[in-house]
Amino acid sequence: MKTLLLTLVVVTIMCLDLGYTTKCYKTGERIISETCPPGQDLCYMKTWCDVFCGSRGRVVELGCTATCPTVKPHEQITCCSTDNCNPHPKMKQR
């Protein structure tokens, strides 16, 4: 009986989310939604123009951050704090 109770306690602890973690979209080879590392509770979207801006549009970078990045000249940055609040501008909203 003690073994059964101990097993149930262990399974319950493993299934619980013991700390809230933010999920953000991240760019890489493809756009994915990932859980942010501890301490990075904000999502961001940074856009800027490169040499192909006229034909391809602005470059978009998505990810997690602890603090909203400092804006450099010719960049636009938005930060938010809810799950997947930083979708790529070309993604369809659900």
UniProtKB/Swiss-Prot annotation:
One of its GO terms (molecular function) is toxin activity. Belongs to the three-finger toxin family. Long-chain subfamily. Type II alpha-neurotoxin sub-subfamily. The keyword Disulfide bond applies. Expressed by the venom gland. CDD domains: TFP_snake_toxin. Keywords: Acetylcholine receptor inhibiting toxin, Disulfide bond, Ion channel impairing toxin, Neurotoxin, Postsynaptic neurotoxin, Secreted, Signal, Toxin. This is Long neurotoxin LNTX8. It is found in: Secreted. One of its GO terms (cellular component) is extracellular region. Binds with high affinity to muscular (alpha-1/CHRNA1) and neuronal (alpha-7/CHRNA7) nicotinic acetylcholine receptor (nAChR) and inhibits acetylcholine from binding to the receptor, thereby impairing neuromuscular and neuronal transmission. The keyword DNA damage does not apply. It comes from the Eukaryota. Disulfide bonds join 24-43, 36-64, 49-53, 68-79, 80-85. It comes from Ophiophagus hannah (King cobra). Residues 1-21 form the signal peptide. It holds the Pfam family Toxin_cobra-type. The lineage of its organism: Eukaryota, Metazoa, Chordata, Craniata, Vertebrata.
